[in-house]
Amino acid sequence: NTISLREDPEAVNRKIRTMPTDPARVRRTDPGEPGRCPVWQLHEIYSGEDVKAWVQQGCTTAGIGCIECKQPVIDAVLKELAPIQERAQAYTQDPDTVKNIIADGCEKARDLARETMRDVRESMGLYYG
């Protein structure tokens, strides 16, 4: 499963909320083991020490449910995606800018390829210019 950089908040929320959790934690009242839960890997990346301690304590004592555990991850992922999506919005609204950027890149690539081929031909003794 993936979360794309331009994923809307509802989809991010849905995808994280439906992530599998500790397979041994069948019921809300069962204590869990964060190390066996894929959501914990996201906490390791996105959560501060205070949230990780809350998850460790809450999960191992069945003090929190899996949905509660996932909410800080959802919030952190959305916060991280927000500036990326804002920058992307500018390009979405102005396709001509995107076309110009691509055209400039193509021109630079052509110039570089032309120089490289000239060097190759010269090295092979095939350059007559």
Label each PLM-derived region with a short phrase.
Residues N1-G129:
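Conserved nucleotide- and phosphate/pyrophosphate-binding catalytic cores
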